[in-house]
């Protein structure tokens, strides 16, 4: 039996992780949960999975959750805020922590889990993008296992099983191309929030769906792959694969290319991260390549996806530039989801913020947190300057 602390239980990764736990009750149990604001769903999850500790976003939400659980005989101990999330990550009786919190909010709980010696099933790419220089040395020092949950990084991890050290030559990260992959580039100026949220293949949360439309999700994954697999940025490439069947590929020293294929279903990488090094049998529909028929690949269009260039630029620059890229993107996407900026303005906000930043050379945690705060404030300042914003 593997015991799990689940950070972000009411989000997309969290609910699918609980689907796995429900499907394999003899293998997995949830001992800790965190959720920011969806107390109704969290209450349902607590009644079903009976965690011992939970954390929520505020004192008011703790009171609301307690009211929803009135009379429940398995009332968990409750904590509040970021400190509460860190408590669940570090003190819930668990062998593995699933980090399903979206954005840089997952950084501190992830560090708390690492410092407590917990293995990580990492679904939060922003943790390594923003905090790679801080997180990875701690992971190595503590000797914890870091198992990727992102479908692309899980695919790479699976492809590398049994590959001798030093044999990895190149990583090819596949991207669906997002909601606007078939739109004329000149029409992107008219793209709405509703348009951006219509992902052609995957069912995901709003933020990552917008990131898919801008290809920022892939840019962040390039930086994450750099930290996970130790390759220079020149050896990590992005390829558009509209069918989302090949989840990523690796090229080895002898030019062999190994790929991992499957239907676009996040439950598979979640299950692999939880069960590794085993592979558990599933009742899920197997991949039928004859039914799929055709798999296509093409280079990404830099004019359509300017965020891709910004991600490589920030990754190569290092320091706190990736932190600023990530934080500025989170704020820009939030502004877009609130319909305060247009689709094409997001990349302009990111570029302007990166240009204004002065990076710390070898950042510590204070540098990372400071750069994160500065970038968010700078994007808000740019948006508030004027309706024209001199970015258009």
Curated annotation (Swiss-Prot):
Catalytic activities: 2-C-methyl-D-erythritol 4-phosphate + NADP(+) = 1-deoxy-D-xylulose 5-phosphate + NADPH + H(+)
Residues bound to 1-deoxy-D-xylulose 5-phosphate are 125, 151-152, 176, 199, 212, 217-218, 221
Question: Which cofactor does the UniProt annotation name?
Answer: Mg(2+); Mn(2+)
> Which residues are listed for Mn(2+) binding in this entry?
150, 152, 221
**Which Gene3D superfamilies does the annotation name?**
1.10.1740.10, NAD(P)-binding Rossmann-like Domain (3.40.50.720)
Q: By its UniProt entry, which InterPro entries does this protein fall under?
A: DXP_reductoisomerase (IPR003821), DXP_reductoisomerase_C (IPR013644), DXP_reductoisomerase_N (IPR013512), DXPR_C (IPR026877), DXPR_C_sf (IPR036169), NAD(P)-bd_dom_sf (IPR036291)
What is this protein's name? Answer: 1-deoxy-D-xylulose 5-phosphate reductoisomerase
């Amino acid at each position: 039996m593997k015991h799990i602390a689940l950070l972000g239980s009411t989000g997309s990764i969290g609910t699918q992780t609980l689907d796995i736990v429900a499907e394999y009750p003899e293998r997995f149990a949830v001992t800790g949960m965190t959720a920011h604001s969806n107390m109704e769903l969290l209450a349902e999850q607590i009644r079903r999975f009976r965690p011992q500790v939970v954390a929520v976003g505020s004192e008011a939400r703790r009171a609301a959750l307690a009211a929803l659980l009135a009379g429940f005989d398995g009332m968990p101990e409750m904590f509040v805020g970021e400190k509460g999330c860190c408590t669940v990550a570090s003190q819930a009786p668990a062998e593995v922590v699933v980090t399903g919190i979206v954005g840089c909010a997952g950084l501190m709980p992830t560090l708390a889990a690492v410092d407590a010696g917990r293995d990580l099933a990492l679904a939060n790419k922003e943790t390594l993008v923003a905090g790679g220089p801080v997180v990875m040395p701690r992971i190595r020092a503590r000797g914890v296992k870091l198992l990727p949950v992102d479908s692309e990084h899980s695919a790479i991890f699976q492809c590398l099983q049994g590959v001798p050290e030093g044999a990895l030559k190149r990583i090819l990260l596949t991207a669906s191309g997002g909601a606007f992959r078939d739109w004329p580039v000149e029409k992107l100026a008219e793209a709405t929030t509703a348009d951006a949220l219509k992902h052609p293949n995957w069912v995901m949360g709003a933020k990552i769906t917008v990131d898919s439309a801008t290809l920022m999700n892939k840019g962040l994954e390039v930086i994450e792959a750099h930290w996970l697999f130790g390759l220079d940025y020149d050896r990590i490439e992005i390829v558009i694969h509209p069918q989302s069947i090949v989840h990523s590929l690796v090229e080895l020293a002898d030019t062999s290319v190994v790929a991992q294929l499957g239907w676009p279903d996040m439950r598979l990488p979640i299950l692999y991260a939880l069960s590794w090094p085993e592979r558990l049998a599933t009742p899920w529909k197997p991949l039928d390549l004859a039914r799929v028929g055709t798999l296509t690949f093409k280079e990404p269009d830099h004019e359509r996806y300017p965020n891709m260039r910004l991600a490589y630029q920030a990754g190569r620059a290092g320091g706190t530039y990736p932190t600023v890229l990530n934080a500025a993107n989170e704020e820009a996407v939030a502004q877009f989801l609130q319909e305060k900026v247009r689709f094409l303005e997001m990349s302009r906000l990111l570029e302007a913020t990166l240009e204004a930043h002065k990076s710390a050379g070898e950042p510590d945690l204070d540098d990372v947190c400071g750069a994160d705060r500065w970038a968010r404030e700078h994007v808000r300042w740019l948006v508030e300057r004027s309706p024209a914003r001199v970015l258009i």
